[in-house]
Regions:
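Beta-strand cores of modular interaction/reader domains in eukaryotic scaffold and signaling proteins
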Residues: 44, 51, 104-106, 120-122, ...
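Extended, low-complexity, polar regulatory segments
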Residues: 1-32, 306, 449
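Membrane-interface recognition of transmembrane alpha-helix starts
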Residues: 25-59
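Conserved, structured regulatory domains from eukaryotic proteins
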Residues: 85-89, 95, 145-186, 193-195, ...
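Primarily EF-hand calcium-binding motifs
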Residues: 327-366, 372-400, 409-424, 429, ...
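Catalytic core of membrane glycerolipid acyltransferases/transacylases, capturing the structured
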Residues: 60-93, 98-104, 113-171
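Eukaryotic intrinsically disordered and solvent-exposed regulatory patches
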Residues: 37, 105-109, 114-117, 126-130, ...
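A cross-family acyltransferase "interaction/gating" segment
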Residues: 152-161, 190-193, 200, 204-280, ...
């Protein structure tokens, strides 16, 4: 008999994402690709490297002059000749650098002025080459890690853009970053426009993941900016699983040309409802961009990347840690640390299986119970798609729903209502309650076992 998928509360809202892993780019080169890159690189790589080094030094010199003896360094906006120098000289040098690297940039749409849109939101963010948008938009401010400002050469160039610095050591960094973005966006033209990649991390461009709220909290008009790399051979995508920074740089410099399309969509002016609800504002802008790109949206976030890395450290497949953290955390009121702890338990159960999934055998072995009808019904409470295995996402959802005192008994009764005769209902319920209490350490089940 085929396994039945038992209805659980809110089951449809926990459907798996359209794109299972947007943080991986396996990109394998064929033997022909490797040979072609090697032959082209003999000439292109050294020539381009020399030219880029020269351009980089000129950019550093321009940035140094523009920020020399800058009044109110970091606290006041650059004005007058300093700002014009950044907008003209540094912008031209950046465009030249991309031209030397072989980029053929096609621009669609019109760039909004500062009064029209204080903030640019660009997506999908998939590469360090996405920085071309800075040159196309007049060198706006960006959001960057504070550590980047202290790097040689690049740090000086970065400081000239007056970035909003984010410090991982400062516990108040997120709050301060949001406050600084809001202050600049509402400055009525005193500060330059701000460029933000709202996804917060790089993906493989197969979807748009959750947008962070920073760009939308000020409640000002934003201009969506789309990025496309329509190349037969992808040498630009920089994800958590894939080619390294160094490998991508070398492969791209060895290409004769690399196509890049940048499209500026119409400015999105928030409604009063969106101004008071930044999540709604972000989701609507994301949907507009996804429609224009013809890609789906998912609820993945940077926190999923952290779980993915943790899964790899636990010898699980890295994609096992992807749970769409935004959706899971909101609907089940879970914190990242709690989900991370559950990953350890899941890894212990799945260690005997292949592929990072729990089968009925591993489930029974971990619970120290024989495979029985009661255990199979319990297993089906977790196996939401009925494929005979439990992945980490199903494990977190199932355990969280069944641990909820508001619906624990209701869920168990629902699972057994149509499969166990009424005269054995009480025994079955008590057995399952005891299984949860003894093996899964679910709080509040002990006294319920006697009541079932």
């Amino acid at each position: 008999m085929a396994p039945r998928v038992l209805p659980l509360p809110r089951q449809q809202s926990f459907n798996p994402p359209t794109v299972l892993n947007p943080f991986v780019h396996p990109g394998r080169l064929s033997a022909g690709d490797k040979l072609r890159i090697a032959l082209q690189g003999i000439i292109l790589l050294p020539l381009r490297a020399i030219c880029i080094t020269f351009i980089l030094l000129l950019a550093w010199l321009s940035a140094s002059i523009a920020t020399f003896c800058q009044p109110g360094r970091g606290f006041l906006p650059l004005e007058g000749w300093r700002r014009r120098m950044i907008q003209t000289t540094l912008s031209s040098l950046t465009r030249t650098a991309y031209f030397v690297m072989g980029f053929q940039v096609k621009v669609k749409g019109k760039v909004a002025s500062l009064p029209e849109a204080p903030i640019f939101v660009a997506a999908p963010h998939s590469s360090f080459f996405d920085g071309i948008i800075c040159a196309l938009t007049g060198m706006p401010s960006i959001v960057s890690r504070a550590e980047n400002l202290s790097t040689p050469v690049f740090g000086t160039i970065l400081r000239s853009l007056q970035p909003v610095a984010v410090s991982r050591q400062d516990p108040d960094s997120r709050k301060n970053t949001v406050a600084e973005i809001t202050k600049r966006a509402l400055s009525k033209g005193q500060w330059p426009q701000i460029l933000i990649f709202p996804e917060g991390t790089c993906t493989n461009r197969s979807c748009l993941i959750t947008f962070k709220q920073g760009a939308f909290l000020p409640g000002v008009p934003v201009q969506p900016v789309l990025l496309r790399y329509p190349n037969k051979l992808d040498t630009v995508t920089w994800t958590w699983q894939g080619y390294s920074f160094k490998e991508l740089c070398i492969m791209t410099l060895c290409q004769i040309f690399t196509r890049l399309e940048v499209e500026f969509l119409p400015v999105h002016v928030p409604t009063e409802e969106e101004k008071s609800d930044p999540i709604l504002f972000a989701n609507r802008v994301r949907q507009i961009m996804a429609n224009a790109l013809n890609v789906p949206i998912t609820d993945h976030t940077f926190e999923d990347c952290r779980l993915m890395i943790s899964a790899g450290q636990l010898t699980l497949p890295m994609e096992a840690g992807l749970v769409e953290f935004t959706k899971i955390s909101k609907k089940l009121n879970l914190k990242w640390n709690h989900v991370r702890e559950q990953l350890d338990t899941f890894a212990a159960i799945a260690s005997a299986s292949k592929g990072g999934r729990i089968g009925i055998e591993e489930f029974a072995e971990y619970l120290k119970l024989p495979i029985s009808d009661v255990l199979k019904e319990l297993f089906l409470l977790f196996d939401r798609n009925g494929d005979g295995t439990i992945d980490f996402r199903e494990y977190v959802i199932g355990l969280s729903i069944l641990c909820n005192p508001a619906n624990t008994e209701e869920t168990i009764r629902m699972a057994f209502k149509k499969s166990i005769p009424s005269y054995s209902m009480d025994i079955a319920l008590q057995s399952v309650c005891l299984v949860f209490f003894q093996a899964l350490q679910i709080p509040g089940i002990a006294h319920r076992a006697a009541e079932c």
